[in-house]
Swiss-Prot record:
Species whose genome carries this gene: Arabidopsis thaliana (Mouse-ear cress)
Record-listed FMN binding positions: 78-80, 107, 128-130, 156, 228, 250, 283-287, 306-307
Entry coiled-coil feature ranges: none
Record's subcellular location: Peroxisome
Native organism taxonomy: Eukaryota, Viridiplantae, Streptophyta, Embryophyta, Tracheophyta
GO molecular function: (S)-2-hydroxy-acid oxidase activity; FMN binding
Record: residues binding a 2-oxocarboxylate: 130, 165, 255
PROSITE patterns recorded: FMN_HYDROXY_ACID_DH_1, FMN_HYDROXY_ACID_DH_2
Biological-process GO terms, alphabetical: defense response to bacterium; hydrogen peroxide biosynthetic process
Catalytic residues, chain numbering: 252
Domain FMN hydroxy acid dehydrogenase: 1-357
Record's protein name: Peroxisomal (S)-2-hydroxyacid oxidase GLO3
One Gene Ontology cellular component annotation held by this UniProt entry: peroxisome
Cofactor(s) the protein needs: FMN
Major site of localization recorded for this protein: other
């Protein structure tokens, strides 16, 4: 594993290790996959404005999210069905997160039970949820999360219906039975045609859930609530007005509405309307420590990593996940040093130049 030096190399190992159906499930996006690809490419169009002759002999990457300290502004995004990638599933991912002193957001669609994940190691964890048509099931899950020591709820708001993921349709992707819902309802779908995941989502997800229903979620938990799936200033303002405790700028990894903007391109408009009242996080397309720096320079408090975690898990289990996080942290630390930023607070908007700024400078 010492020979692996970047996320792309882990992706290739994951492709070799996983059955095609599972690799396509994790790696694919919606329809033309424009948004999926643009998430990554948009970071590459942002350039640095490094400052020199700054004392960077000591670099401090640490920060806090909702008051919880983490070693670097790199968290684990919610992704489902980790046992499709590795037999230990989310418990391996959780142990790696704990070892790296970061926060894991556990998916509602996890293979392991929330209690198994919580008992696997001592760490800060948030729980991502969808709201099902049967609200009682969502309420039960939230109460279980509270009892298991989860510290926040992350409400995904961009899935009234599942995006059209053509690889899953072609592969007849199964929807496995999830242990968290045994005795409540069946999550298993093995389709004769089409995507089982899409069939399950159509049956289970509540497409009527709206901003006014945030009050319902608040009524059943005292945990902080973050909303994941914000892409516009209008919805960012609605989130603040609804009293949520944080925003995650996300397009669901390019898996929902194709031709949605890359998350890094809309981060600033969200940050500007939020005005520091609540934390703003970002996911989508982060593959390098340089990407982490760019997101922070444009106003994010931290980034979430999704697919790279799965690549590490599929390739090398817990150790693979740790390696992915450690690589990104190392790259981020070097970027801070070379940009003249000894601490997170030293990273400013003046350290980057976006594509629009470059184009305007040419006029």
């Amino acid at each position: 594993m010492d020979q692996i030096v970047n996320v792309d190399e882990f992706q290739e190992l994951a492709k070799q290790a996983l059955p095609k159906m599972y690799y396509d499930f994790y790696n694919g996006g919606a329809e033309d996959q424009h948004t999926l690809n643009e998430n990554v490419q948009a970071f590459r169009r942002i350039m640095f404005r490094p400052r020199v002759l700054v004392d960077v002999s000591k670099i401090d990457m640490s920060t806090k999210i909702l008051g919880y300290p983490i070693s670097a502004p790199i968290m684990i995004a919610p992704t489902g069905n980790h046992k499709l990638a590795h037999p230990e599933g989310e418990t391996a991912t959780a142990k790696a997160a704990a070892a790296c002193n970061t926060i894991m957001i556990v998916s509602y669609m996890s293979s392991c039970t929330f209690e198994e994940i919580a008992s696997s190691c001592n760490a800060v964890r948030f729980l991502q949820i969808y709201v099902y048509k049967r609200r009682d099931i969502t309420a039960q899950v939230v109460k279980r999360a509270e009892k298991a020591g989860f510290k926040a709820i992350v409400l995904t708001v961009d899935v009234p219906r599942l995006g059209r993921r053509e690889a899953d349709i072609k592969n007849k992707m199964i929807s496995p039975q999830l242990k968290n819902f045994e005795g409540l309802f069946s999550t298993e779908v093995r389709p004769s045609k089409g995507s089982g995941v899409q069939a399950f989502a159509s049956r289970a997800f509540d497409a009527s859930f709206s901003w006014k229903d945030i009050e319902w979620l608040r009524s059943i938990t005292e945990l902080p609530i973050l909303v994941k799936g914000i892409l516009t200033r209008e919805d960012a303002l609605k989130a603040v007005e609804a009293g949520v405790d944080g925003i995650i700028v996300s397009n669901h990894g390019g898996r929902q509405l194709d031709y949605s903007p890359a998350t890094i391109t809309v981060l600033e408009e969200v940050v500007q309307v939020v005005r520091g009242r609540i934390p703003v996080l970002l996911d989508g397309g982060v593959r390098r420590g340089t990407d982490v720096f760019k997101a922070l320079a444009l106003g994010a408090q931290a980034v979430l990593i999704g697919r790279p975690i799965i690549y590490g898990l599929a390739a090398k289990g817990e150790d693979g996940v740790k390696k992915v996080i450690d690589m990104l942290k190392n790259e981020f630390e070097i970027t801070m040093a070379l940009s003249g930023c000894p601490t997170i607070d030293d990273i400013t908007r003046n350290h980057v130049r976006t594509e629009n700024e470059r184009l305007h400078s040419m006029l």
